[in-house]
From Swiss-Prot:
PANTHER family listed in its UniProt record: RIBOSOMAL PROTEIN S9 (PTHR21569), SMALL RIBOSOMAL SUBUNIT PROTEIN US9M (PTHR21569:SF1)
InterPro entries registered for this protein in UniProt: Ribosomal_Su5_D2-typ_SF, Ribosomal_uS9, Ribosomal_uS9_bac/plastid, Ribosomal_uS9_CS, Ribsml_uS5_D2-typ_fold_subgr
Family: Belongs to the universal ribosomal protein uS9 family.
BP-aspect Gene Ontology terms: translation
Entry protein name: Small ribosomal subunit protein uS9
Lineage, broadest ranks: Bacteria, Bacillati, Actinomycetota, Actinomycetes, Mycobacteriales
SUPFAM superfamilies: Ribosomal protein S5 domain 2-like
Gene: rpsI
Length: 151
């Protein structure tokens, strides 16, 4: 009985970057945030990003966005295990970065389902439902009313 107890704990520890993955085909997922839609392809590799034909640093010069995107890979300690090819469309930089993060997290689960609890706890699997509120007629913006004069 003592031998069966440590066995489940061994795979729960995050695998190091030395572990290589053999996939019969690339993992494909979709991430969405605000108006942005990102199609992600995950293949075993060295940690290279190809975003619409450009590198991560070239496409997202903002360091905050770069950290946001790499966060799921850092959480499961697989930064240099995969190459990521993504087609980003719609929205702005912040929405695209959030959509890419969701797509990467979903792909990592398909590769190794044992990483799901760590990614779920970090909040990387939750689709952020916040979107721009629509403008209403009679108002200047979604909620801003024109100035009111009592007399």
């Amino acid at each position: 009985m003592t031998e069966t107890t440590p066995a489940p704990q061994t795979p729960a520890a995050p695998a190091g970057p030395a572990q290589s993955f053999v996939l019969e085909r690339p993992i494909q997922t979709v991430g969405r945030r605000k108006e942005a839609v990102v199609r992600v392809r995950l293949v075993p590799g060295t940690g290279k990003f190809d975003l619409n034909g450009r590198s991560l640093e070239d496409y997202f010069p903002n360091k905050v966005h770069q950290q946001l995107i790499k966060a799921p890979l850092v959480t499961v300690d697989r930064v240099e295990s995969f190459d990521i090819f993504a087609h980003l469309g719609g929205g702005g930089p912040s929405g695209q970065a959030g959509a890419l993060r969701l797509g990467i997290a979903r792909a990592l689960i398909l590769v190794s389902p044992e990483d799901r609890p760590a990614l779920k706890k970090a909040g990387f699997l939750t689709r952020d439902p916040r979107a721009t509120e629509r403008k209403k007629y009679g108002l200047k913006k979604a909620r801003k009313a024109p100035q009111y004069s009592k007399r």
